[in-house]
């Protein structure tokens, strides 16, 4: 890997204590909801916590959300059952941050222009402050890759070219 672009990485360490507790509860609730009610209900709760209203997303001309493929649904299952629970129990410590710092020249931190300071946005800016890195803005919000695919790809090329990639 030459460069990693981390778009709104979810690292609870960079939330204030009250937000961390709320985020941990939302993770637990989304996980339990998934087991009882399935994907749609769980992701609705998760999205709402992160300021995403799927019924009110803005799209670039011609863009729309596509139905999820079987592979994407399997990825969502893994995300909800394995990754989400780890958010509230596994956090970077100083030694983990040191590992990231050692490779920070290969890291681009990014947020969406429409993220409106949601918790992922705050996590990203907290990580950037700890690492001494800038935050690049990309079109759209947390799901900007899907709502603004052309503009997002254009911005990604700009960011990578500016880094000589």
Each model region followed by its residue ranges:
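A structural signal for isolated positions on well-ordered beta-strands in alpha/beta enzyme cores
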Residues: 3-5, 108, 136
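Generic structural signal for helix capping and beta-alpha/helix-loop junctions
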Residues: 13, 117, 144-145
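Alpha/beta-hydrolase
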Residues: 22-29, 33-126, 130-134
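Low-complexity, flexible helical/coil segments
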Residues: 18, 38-47, 142-152
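Catalytic active-site module of serine/aspartate enzymes centered on a nucleophile-bearing elbow/loop
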Residues: 122-165
